Swiss-Prot record:
NCBIfam families attached to this UniProt entry: PRK13674.1-1
Similarity comment: Belongs to the GTP cyclohydrolase IV family.
One Gene Ontology term from the biological process aspect of the record: tetrahydrofolate biosynthetic process
Gene transcribed to yield this protein: folE2
UniProtKB keywords: Hydrolase
Organism superkingdom: Bacteria
Keyword match Transcription: no
Function (record text): Converts GTP to 7,8-dihydroneopterin triphosphate.
Cystine connections: none
Known EC number: 3.5.4.16
Annotated site residues (May be catalytically important) in this chain: 150
Organism taxonomic ancestry: Bacteria, Pseudomonadati, Verrucomicrobiota, Verrucomicrobiia, Verrucomicrobiales
Reaction(s) catalysed (UniProt annotation): GTP + H2O = 7,8-dihydroneopterin 3'-triphosphate + formate + H(+)
Name of the protein described by the UniProt record: GTP cyclohydrolase FolE2
Pathway assigned to this chain's UniProt record: Cofactor biosynthesis; 7,8-dihydroneopterin triphosphate biosynthesis; 7,8-dihydroneopterin triphosphate from GTP: step 1/1
Amino acid sequence: MQELKDTQSEADTRNISIDRVGVKGLRFPIQIQDKLNRIQSTVATVSLAVDLPEEFKGTHMSRFVEALHQHGPLLDVHTALAIPRELLRRLSARRSHVEMEFPFFRSKNAPVTGIEGLMDYVVRFEMEAEANNKLADFKLTVIVPVTTLCPCSKAMSAYGAHNQRGLVTYSVRFASRPVWIEDLIDLVESCASCSLFSVLKRPDEKWVTEKAYENPVFVEDLVRNVALKTQSHSAFSWYRVEAENFESIHNHQAYAVIERDLRS
């Protein structure tokens, strides 16, 4: 076979290193083991990147996809962390970054009738590795839709209170053992006025309406509730919780964030 020119490995004279270069928007089938020991097949949108020293013109894009394919579809915290390490090896890089975002489904029964339905959540794995550090960084994020009901509206109004759907983006790093995706979702849902369901009959709708009315929370309450539960859990070394409410009486969102390092 004729030897082809390797343009990427040529020298670059501009003396500017690149923080991250790679591929993004790559869709890849994966399998996730859930808390009930079942394998869930889903499709992840993947980003893979490494640093590029100033002396090199380009990186080798095909090697990113090769590294992903080598590790197969079944992913957990341990197998996923092998991917950024493999990028370091294949591309002779000093730092690597991998991000995978995918829909995660779980069965959820309606609160009164017990009718089963599937709820979908967005889950994100973010991993970084460095050539001079044996410990790779892993961050798990769940994006959980919830219901919130306004405490101020309830206190002032003779009839009802405004309520809305919100999104909680909850990210954690683990201090020791990993925590199941489902447990993170449950933690967030327990802090809202009410959780969401995909199937509700009339008795269920009555129940969720009254449940939200009995548990009013501001967006500030929501992030503080999640923060308190996180800080009481020894499994976490860091967290970030962001809540966004799609206000039903405004054409804008309400928003709050808490981020803490729990190692000190």
